[in-house]
Amino acid sequence: MDQEAGFMVNFINSYFIALGVLIGGALIGGLGAYLAGEPPLTAITKLANRLKIWALVAAIGGTFDAVYSFERGILEGNTRDIFKQLLLIISAMGGAQSGWLIISWLTQEHLSS
């Protein structure tokens, strides 16, 4: 995430980036499944389940920023950076979970099982 922007901006961006990656990836993947002759709603549900971790990684800006923040927090005693990074990860997890829930509501795939 951008270090110059305020923390709340990064917090909100993290949520919506994860939400967008999950919903967008699942819907575009469902379109691809439809064009390939496969059931699109089933494909959307499966993709949403598989994209949760990638939405999280995309939202926090890759793994190196997170590792660097944890390293700085542990080695330099700057616990504020660790706390901020944990909050960003929780925000991204919330966005990914919200996206998965929206996809689940749209597809209603869990009802057909």
From Swiss-Prot:
Annotated GO biological process: sporulation resulting in formation of a cellular spore
Consequence of gene loss (knockout): Impaired ability to form spores when associated with a ytrI deletion. In combination with a ybaN deletion, cells show a severe sporulation defect.
Membrane topology note: Multi-pass membrane protein
InterPro entries: Spore_YtrH
Induction or repression: Transcriptionally regulated by sigma-E.
Swiss-Prot/TrEMBL keywords: Membrane, Sporulation, Transmembrane, Transmembrane helix
GO cellular component terms attached to this protein's record: membrane
Pfam families with a match to the protein in the record: Spore_YtrH
Annotated localization: Forespore outer membrane
Name of the protein described by the UniProt record: Sporulation membrane protein YtrH
Segments crossing the lipid bilayer: 16-36, 51-71, 86-106
Biological role stated in the UniProt entry: Involved in sporulation. May contribute to cortex formation or stability.
